[in-house]
């Protein structure tokens, strides 16, 4: 059956269109965009008062599948994605076994056929994330990987990283770099600063991120190949990326809503749900990241969706790093950046829908006739309080718990079919 979205406010930065319009979907593709479309036989959704954008692409998630499915799996992760208007994700390789071979890639893609989002695997740079033996990038790309990364760990050896960047480029993939000097981290669990000192816990100096970010930029510039910097959180890394991009280095980067909304002051609660990697930084860093979003230094907003079971998050100092984010990313971005006048809806769509797909060279991200019908429909003005118990993710470790966010996903369309309706599990 055809699907007709009536009276919505359509925002499509890929085409530049913004305004009231109807969208008619036939099979899995957009057939027509215009005013007063009539399709009596179609399933009709009244989108009056709602905003219609391309489905969001989150290019940085952890679905824990295979190997840690007590935290999340591809199906529950897909449910969380659909509830957040996310129709495509890139899942990181720190699974068990690692995504370092075609067999694991095939397992993920086969299971993802039943998920309520499109799942694109990211292969690992080195075997088992060990940092020593490089994977076969041609094999991974042929199997279905869209990028490579040792995310969760840095590639410590600069020679291996340089070789990986070149080989990935010629294999048709980007390297996504987790920028962290583990020797500087040295067991730290939160940002090094006044709060960590007052709490008496070991801090992570911002240099741990800045040094490796600068290394990756230098390699990209010298080798004349691309690099994508994951989850940027510090003011200095932001400035280094900005400067490099202006001088023509092929560097792109991403950040997550918690890095432009929250600070390490929240760690005073000694609640491990505010611990992630990289850690929450200072108000000055939040301002710098926000400026990077505004001036287009930052290309993408992602979540780094990292589920952990409640018992694993119980002990503040021993808990693993990571927070879930798929169901809050759009609302958090609307709250912090759109409703405060810092960015437009066009810019939001570019950050969350267009650029991630461009960087990964995957389809979607626009609402033109002929395009795949992956669509997010939301009420930009509806306020709601984040209740972890109501999240669709298997894990509930959200750093936005108890916060009031403005903007709520009402429907998600995947491949021409409604896969999520607000209020209906």
Go through the PLM ranges and name each one.
Residues 8, 23, 28, 49, ...:
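Divalent metal-coordination and catalytic microenvironments
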Residues 198-226, 273, 294-301, 306-381:
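His/Asp/Glu-enriched, well-ordered alpha-helical/loop segment
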Residues 110-125:
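A glycine-rich helix N-cap at a beta->alpha junction
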Residues 134-301:
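Histidine/acidic residue-rich metal-binding segments in metalloenzymes
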Residues 50-112:
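Metal-associated gating/positioning segment near the N- to mid-region
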Residues 62-71, 90-102, 122-134, 149-160, ...:
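Divalent metal-binding segments
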Residues 1-55:
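Histidine-rich, glycine-flanked metal-binding segment
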Residues 8, 315, 372-425:
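C-terminal cap of metal-dependent C-N hydrolases
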């Amino acid at each position: 059956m055809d699907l007709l979205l009536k009276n919505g406010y359509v925002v499509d930065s890929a085409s530049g269109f913004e305004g009231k319009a109807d969208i008619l979907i036939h099979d899995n593709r957009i057939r027509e965009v215009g005013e007063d479309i009539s399709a009596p036989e179609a399933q009709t959704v009244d989108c009056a008062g709602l905003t219609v954008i391309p489905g969001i692409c989150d290019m940085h998630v952890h679905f824990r599948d295979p190997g840690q499915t007590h935290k999340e799996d591809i199906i529950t992760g897909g449910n969380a994605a659909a509830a957040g208007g996310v129709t495509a994700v890139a899942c990181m390789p720190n699974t068990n076994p690692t995504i370092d071979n075609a067999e694991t890639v095939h397992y993920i893609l086969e299971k993802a056929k039943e998920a309520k989002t499109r799942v694109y695997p990211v292969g690992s740079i080195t075997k088992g994330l060990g940092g020593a033996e490089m994977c076969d990038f041609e094999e991974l790309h042929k199997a279905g990987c869209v990028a490579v990364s040792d995310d969760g760990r840095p590639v410590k050896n600069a020679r291996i990283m340089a070789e990986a960047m070149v080989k990935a480029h010629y294999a048709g993939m980007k390297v996504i770099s987790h920028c962290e000097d583990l020797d500087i981290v040295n067991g730290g669990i939160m940002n090094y600063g006044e709060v960590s000192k007052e709490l008496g816990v070991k801090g992570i100096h911002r240099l741990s991120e800045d040094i490796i970010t600068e290394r990756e930029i230098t390699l990209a510039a010298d080798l004349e190949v691309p690099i994508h910097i994951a989850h940027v959180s510090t003011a200095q890394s932001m400035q280094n990326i900005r400067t490099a991009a202006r001088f023509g280095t092929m560097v792109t980067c991403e950040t997550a809503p918690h890095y432009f909304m929250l600070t390490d002051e929240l760690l005073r609660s000694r609640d491990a749900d505010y611990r992630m990697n990289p850690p929450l930084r200072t108000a000055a860093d939040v301002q710098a990241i926000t400026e990077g979003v505004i001036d287009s230094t930052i290309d993408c907003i992602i979540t780094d969706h990292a589920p952990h079971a409640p018992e694993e998050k119980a002990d503040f100092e021993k808990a693993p790093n990571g927070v879930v984010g798929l169901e809050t990313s759009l609302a958090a971005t609307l709250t912090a950046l759109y409703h405060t006048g810092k960015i437009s809806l066009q810019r939001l769509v570019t950050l969350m829908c267009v650029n991630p797909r461009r960087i990964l060279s995957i389809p979607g991200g626009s609402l033109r006739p002929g395009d795949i019908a992956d669509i997010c429909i939301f009420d930009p003005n509806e306020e709601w309080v984040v209740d972890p118990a109501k999240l669709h993710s298997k894990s509930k470790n959200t750093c936005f718990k108890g916060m009031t966010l403005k903007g709520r996903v009402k429907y998600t369309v995947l491949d021409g079919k409604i896969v999520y309706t607000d209020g209906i599990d």
